[in-house]
Amino acid sequence: MWSPEREAEAPAGGDPAGLLPPEWEEDEERMSFLFSAFKRSREVNSTDWDSKMGFWAPLVLSHSRRQGVVRLRLRDLQEAFQRKGSVPLGLATVLQDLLRRGELQRESDFMASVDSSWISWGVGVFLLKPLKWTLSNMLGDNKVPAEEVLVAVELLKEKAEEVYRLYQSSPLSSHPVVALSELSTLCANSCPDERTFYLVLLQLQKEKRVTVLEQNGEKIVKFARGPHAKVSPVNDVDVGVYQLMQSEQLLSRKVESLSQEAERCKEEARRACRAGKKQLALRSLKAKQRTEKRIEALHAKLDTVQGILDRIYASQTDQMVFNAYQAGVGALKLSMKDVTVEKAESLVDQIQELCDTQDEVSQTLAGGVTNGLDFDSEELEKELDILLQDTTKEPLDLPDNPRDRHFTNSVPNPRISDAGLEAELEKLSLSEGGLVPSGKSPKRQLEPTLKPL
């Protein structure tokens, strides 16, 4: 499916049909509809109106972008979009709609919105609208004349941004003030003609990124220092630096010219010497020496001018660094406004106290319930070592502990039958006096039986 982006990516030049939407050559019925004129009012058939406008409006703008132009005329568009000898009959309506939406603007209206008085200084590329255009507007006729120049607003903004970046990346950006002629040479590839170049400058001026001034009959342009900064008016310092830069260029050209003259005198002396014309050779050498002295004097002046410019550039850098330091100090003061050493120490103490409390809580939760008994791990380790040492010794020959025997015998045997249990119970009931037999429970063993009196 065709889109303005695809058409914009197509290379400029060549067969126009190859740069246009697919239906341009494939769908005769649709192209006949698109080449027909618009109805007098959109309300008559809004679907057909919107379909045509949706096709032609993006195509007009993308065609201009692909061609690298910001200025367009109805006549040029009709020639560009000819198809089999026919021209689109609705292009004037399309341009009127783009004007209404603000995507296009009359060149004269754009100039009136910006201070363009400097353009009249010997630059006769912009003229007032012809009288018939003015009368047609006064009478309410909104038709676009075939020769009237319109400006694509968005394309002009893109071109202005391109020129600004081109300047920023060039050696001319070493100082914000530059000669208009030098800037025009720099932008020769970006701006196809002089009128486009001046429109771009007007757009940059409208965005407050450049200002134009005439100095000694020559126009100079001052740029803003940063991409988001606003340009300041041209002051005496800017003019002085510009004059120094012009002097540097003039001296450099003069030195180059004198160097070529000195070399020419040297060649003349060599030829005269070969021809045996000694006096002529001496005169040529004297002229060479005089030229070299002039070159030395010009070099001294050039060094002085360059030294002054270097100091100015260094001072500008120092000013930028100073401003950065000043901004940094202000930011630090603002960020440290409520911070003091006492507050910092108090905050650290609170953090330490909270950390200690957290450690105590963690230890308490990790210890669990101990029934009030605290065990010393070191003492337990010592006792365990003693027990391990005792196991290596021979056991003592001691009598059996009756309590152990009684306790062992008192444990019921799960294998005893019911008859055995009854016999055991009978023994318990008949036993009187003395200690309970060894087969009785440990509790009864510890209770002596009293004899009757």
Swiss-Prot record:
Biased composition (Low complexity): 10-22
Residue ranges the record marks as coiled coil: 243-312
Pfam families documented for this protein: Snf7 (PF03357), WHD_CHMP7 (PF25239)
UniProt region (Disordered), positions on chain: 1-22, 392-453
Gene3D superfamilies tied to this protein: 6.10.250.1710, ESAT-6-like
Top-level taxon of the source organism: Eukaryota
Subunit architecture: Interacts with CHMP4B, but not with VPS25. Interacts with LEMD2 (via C-terminus).
Family statement drawn from the similarity comment of this UniProt entry: Belongs to the SNF7 family.
Protein name: Charged multivesicular body protein 7
Taxonomic placement: Eukaryota, Metazoa, Chordata, Craniata, Vertebrata
Name of the coding gene: CHMP7
